[in-house]
Curated annotation (Swiss-Prot):
Pfam families for this protein: IGPD
Catalytic reaction(s) noted: D-erythro-1-(imidazol-4-yl)glycerol 3-phosphate = 3-(imidazol-4-yl)-2-oxopropyl phosphate + H2O
Protein name: Imidazoleglycerol-phosphate dehydratase
Highest taxon in the source lineage: Bacteria
Lineage of the species this protein comes from: Bacteria, Pseudomonadati, Pseudomonadota, Betaproteobacteria, Burkholderiales
UniProt KW Oxidoreductase keyword: no
InterPro entries, A to Z: IGPD_sf, ImidazoleglycerolP_deHydtase, ImidazoleglycerP_deHydtase_CS, Ribosomal_Su5_D2-typ_SF
Cellular component terms (Gene Ontology): cytoplasm
Gene that this polypeptide is encoded by: hisB
PANTHER family in UniProt: IMIDAZOLEGLYCEROL-PHOSPHATE DEHYDRATASE, IMIDAZOLEGLYCEROL-PHOSPHATE DEHYDRATASE HIS7
């Protein structure tokens, strides 16, 4: 099984993330940021990745450090669990609708971190959650999972729906990219022979 556990402690946050890339979507998530917990649940369920995440952060200031550092730590755990990338499909994509909202997410486990992020949220907050933190989460994740990630919210007027379609599509694209292709054997999906 492709599993990993990472603990990351700073002066601002204390975070532990455990992942099972070959899971069933089970999750235990407690970041102290309820909307983030809801979005991480979407990744687990739609990616069929088991997630166990516990975060304690400086929420008395705001949620920025916690959200970003959860992204960083999750990215580190995914990278560790993926390992050499032998046999990996490497690429994944998904379109996900939710009522009026539609998002597209495309992933390449290239070893080169890059984020193309295009969400024009219709409001600045979803409940207590600052929508700007969505980018911070994905930037942290991308930088440490060493993936290229394209996120496009194609339409939507309900900010909750916009965000949820992105996280669901990310989970589904991640599931596709991380699948092992039996025809690949132990080959790495690159002409370089390494990713």
């Amino acid at each position: 099984m492709r599993t990993a556990e990472i603990t990351r402690n700073t002066n601002e946050t204390r975070i532990r993330v455990a992942v099972n890339l070959d899971g069933t979507g089970k999750q235990t998530i407690d970041t102290g940021v309820p909307f983030l917990d809801h979005m991480l649940d979407q990744i687990a369920r739609h990616g069929l990745i088991d997630l166990d995440i516990k975060a304690d952060g400086d929420l008395h200031i705001d949620a920025h450090h916690t959200v970003e550092d959860v992204g960083i730590t999750l990215g580190m755990a995914i990278a560790k669990a993926v390992g050499s990338k032998a046999g990996l499909r490497r690429y994944g994509h998904a379109y996900v609708p939710l009522d009026e909202a539609l998002s597209r997410v495309v992933i390449d486990f290239s070893g080169r971190p890059g984020l193309e992020y295009h969400i024009d949220f219709t409001r600045a907050r979803i409940g207590d959650f600052d929508v700007d933190l969505t980018r911070e989460f994905f930037q942290g994740l991308v930088n440490h999972a060493l993936m290229t990630l394209h996120i496009d919210n194609l339409r939507g007027f309900n900010a909750h729906h916009q965000c949820e379609t992105v996280f669901k599509a990310f989970g589904r694209a991640l599931r596709m990219a991380l699948e092992v292709d039996p025809r690949m054997g132990d080959a790495v999906p690159s002409t370089k022979g390494v990713l």
